[in-house]
Curated annotation (Swiss-Prot):
A GO biological process held by the record: mRNA processing
Protein name per its UniProtKB record: Putative poly(A) polymerase catalytic subunit
Gene Ontology molecular function terms on file: ATP binding; poly(A) RNA polymerase activity
Bias kind Low complexity: ranges: 546-569
Region Disordered, annotated ranges: 522-584
Organism annotation: Acanthamoeba polyphaga mimivirus
Location in or out of the cell: Virion
GO cellular component, one term: virion component
Classification of source organism: Viruses, Varidnaviria, Bamfordvirae, Nucleocytoviricota, Megaviricetes
Superkingdom field: Viruses
Amino acid sequence: MLKNKTRAEKYQTYYTTNEYQIVKEKLPDIIRDAEIKASEVLEPTIYEKRAIMEVIKDFIRDHQRKVYGGTALNEALKQVNPKDAIYDNYSFSDIEFYSPTPVQDLVDLCNILYRKGYKFVQGKDAQHEETYSIFVNFQLYCDITYSPTRVFYGIKTIEIDGINYTDPHFMLIDYLRMVNQPLTAAGQRWEKAFERMYRLLKDYPIEDFDKRLDIPEPPEEIQSYISRIKTEFLSDNKLNESFLISGIEAYNFYIRHAASSKDEEQMARTNRNVVNLNNFIANVPFSELISVNYREDVKNTYNFLRMIVEDKEKISVDEYFPLFQFTGYSTVIKYDDHPIIRIYEGDGYCIPNVKTVKTVENDNGTKTKYEYKYVSFQYVLMILYINKFRAHLDKNKPMYFNYGIAISNLVKARNIYLDQTGKSVLDNTVFKEFRTNCTGNTISFTRMNRLRLLEKRKQGKQTSFVYTPEDFFKKDLETQAKLDPSKARFKNTSGNKIMVPKYLLFKIDNNGNIEDNIHSEEAEISEKEETSGGSSISTDKSFEESPNSSPNSSPNNSLNNSIDISTNNYDDRSENSLDSLTSD
């Protein structure tokens, strides 16, 4: 009988440590070679993509649209340092541009591509609200984003090869918006945003001004009210949960913090020998607060001010539409026509901030503790850029330049502080970037998009738009004639003062009391109203090209009639509804 023998198990190495390092080093180049080969043979090939992209670029040139996003950054970087470009000849990226008439542009551009013989041409809603995508042969080629006429003509650009690309520092606002949304953007966007922001600021650095802000001091009475908002009104712990200090007051907070550090007069990053940071402190023209409980906080603030002002009859309230994608609604409360406070709607966002505690000794020897929340350094930097843009739209030259100086001073103070303390931008100081602690409730973009579609469906509104030229041109001429892209409606995000009562969020009764306007309607504007409103561009080159403010329009009721103009859905991201825009 044979004896059972147990064989000793032996193992062998497949990759040595040295081989692992070699593969890690060389694999990216091998992958890149494979991607280039794939782009040349897989449909749609890189050659087809390039040809289609040239058609789109010609459209952008002819219609003077404004390109933003990755393509705009790539072209701007190439002008300064081609090595900093984020794309190469074999990298393909869709192109994004702003338009005051995005639906009309979508239809026209789809028709051009279809008539040139390209297959599977389709335009449809993108995932971002008021943005539309064009696909050709199942490939995404461009996103067209609605921009109010007033905003569109106010966007500064650089022209390259006949195409207007958004100014790099206008692009910076978008990157700052990403880093100021820690709960919804960190996982997917922060790494890319930081890399792009680094290259942008390296090639297009922030201008260094040697000036103080020239903001007039408000009347003493207004200063008193501004101070009491902070020391009395915001001392309420409940309000502290929903209010964040922003604007020039937040700017002063960071300047003072940098000035309190030792040896603040020595500056390594700014290449200057002497500076007194206390000179950067600016007059606060009015308080600026961001509220994550907007409606209640506006009413509470108004009621507080009515209690402390000398003459209640002199209080007034102005409301403003959201400014593009940058801010929500805002309310300015004035006394004797002098602004005391501007409150911005921050609902739906979790806003990064710095919490502070200040103890003050009272006359009777007792001590009072004040706790405040200031928006984070990166957030106030973003707000200064947005306010600078708003001042440009409003043709407010003094404040336009003041905000430019404030941006310069804020960055300078931060650099001084970090150099002299030996801290980094990620160390736990008030200048810490990429903060994850935030105030406010938010939801993911995908969830918000789905909830928005559900709400539209409940209201009987059109939930999606798909345009396929191949299907459209098969219809009879009478049906074709009903298509009217100019009936597309968009939210009023002009940033203008709200003049029509039915669009106001608040109502002041005959006794001066404030309440919600329960009959408030959401203001919309059509493409036809955008184009008929007109705009003119200032020739004052000492400032910037700037449009005249377009008047607020009173839109008609939303379009109810619709027809199908597509029987094919070339992308599964959209809803099943294929409603269109038609003439009555």
